[in-house]
């Protein structure tokens, strides 16, 4: 859980900076209220696990090429499934690559898949080893307490954010139904007035 929350937080920070550069203002880019983007947590935990399954060569280090392809495929799959699921459940897109060439449903595109592959190499070869060294002195019982507290906060945030999104969807549905009724009335009036 520790890595999930840490990388979810780092991912949230990356998203906020990216949005700030594009929009020139600070925006919470996540679905959740708290400072975490779970898709980054899932992506990094999945990547760390996947890379750990690769047999080590004599050099004792997984090749950057292998990490690139594993990371590119894994993160693209997570982005596709996550984007599709979020849209189907909440009817909101948190990212949209529709304007990019060769995109698939606006959920994924090769340009970002290549960036995820490069990012995977950077994270596994540079960032993760530094963070692992920095967190190894933390006693297990402290880490367990931190994980439990973060998990409780995360579950509450997911529940509250989901309730808010579902409430918003209901409200938007009601507005759409009202719009449709107004359209029917407008069409009837147009017919009567000729």
Ranges and model annotations:
Residues 1-194:
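Aromatic-rich, lipid-facing transmembrane alpha helices and their immediate juxtamembrane interface loops
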